[in-house]
Design a protein with these regions (language model features):
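Charged, cofactor-coupling segments
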Residues: 1-90
């Protein structure tokens, strides 16, 4: 769970809600997978990209692309511009 904690002051945590779905079933058994059901961007200003792996960055960029694709159709132009900036690739 990503978060920022200011010692002796406060903390902020970002969490997504997920559901577990049945996936493929094969000779090894029933596989499950997670489906994200909340789509809110991470605050990019709160990230120290130097601590992130290539996988972390690729995951975040893909997640932000999905956030924009799912949420933007419900927004007016000013809100879309804000979301476009908030979900920009890093």
């Amino acid at each position: 769970e990503p978060g920022v904690y200011v010692e002796g002051s406060h903390g902020i945590r970002h969490e997504n809600e997920m559901v577990v779905r049945k996936g493929e079933k094969n000779e090894y058994g029933q596989f499950m997978y997670f489906e994200t059901i909340t789509f809110v961007p991470f605050d990019l200003d709160g990230l120290d990209v130097s601590l992130m792996t290539r996988y972390d960055i690729e995951w975040l960029n893909a997640y932000h692309a999905e956030v924009f694709a799912k949420v933007s159709p419900y927004l007016n132009e000013a809100e879309k511009e804000w979301l476009k900036h908030a979900t920009r690739a890093i």
